[in-house]
């Protein structure tokens, strides 16, 4: 009986911990992403559904892969009311290039904010011939 109560207490504690973690807003994985990318966007509707469309510019000379965008829906005071993470179509963004994106909005809001949530840069290894 004591073991059962202990297991239940442990499960409740784990659920409480997960709930408090889930309540934290998402933030970009790479602080300072703005040094490498510029994002512009505007809201629009397609068949009565809200979307954001815009462009992401890779101002760094290296291809970015697995690019994900973080879309924040904000209320009139700037507080986050909803968030979503979306993959950039194609997921690759060559260096010094611009790519168009569209993201469906889950919850309409007063304003939106789009940031680069995650990415990897492809750095190629250079193989030097060995001297004889």
Identify the meaning behind each predicted range:
Residues 82-112, 116-122:
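Short, solvent-exposed, Trp/other aromatic-anchored flexible loops in extracytoplasmic proteins
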Residues 9-17:
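Bacterial N-terminal signal peptides
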Residues 1-8:
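Bacterial N-terminal signal peptides that target proteins for export
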Residues 20-49, 123-132:
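Transition segment at domain starts
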Residues 73-82:
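Short aromatic-acidic-glycine turn motif
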Residues 56-60:
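Asparagine-centered strand-capping/turn motif at beta-strand->loop junctions
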Residues 68-72:
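Beta-strand signatures of extracellular beta-sandwich domains
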Residues 61-66:
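A short beta-turn/strand-edge loop motif at beta-sheet boundaries
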């Amino acid at each position: 009986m004591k073991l059962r109560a202990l297991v239940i207490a442990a499960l409740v504690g784990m659920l409480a911990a997960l709930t408090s973690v889930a309540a934290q807003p998402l933030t970009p994985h790479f602080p300072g992403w703005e040094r490498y990318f510029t994002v512009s966007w505007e809201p629009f509707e397609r068949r009565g559904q809200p979307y954001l469309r815009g462009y992401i510019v890779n101002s760094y000379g290296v291809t970015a892969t697995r690019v994900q965008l973080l879309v924040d829906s904000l209320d009139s005071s700037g507080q986050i009311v909803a968030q979503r993470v979306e993959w950039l179509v194609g997921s690759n963004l060559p260096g010094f290039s611009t790519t168009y994106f569209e993201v469906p909005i889950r919850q309409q809001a007063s304003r939106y904010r789009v940031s680069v949530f995650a990415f990897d840069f492809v750095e190629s290894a250079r193989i030097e011939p060995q001297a004889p």
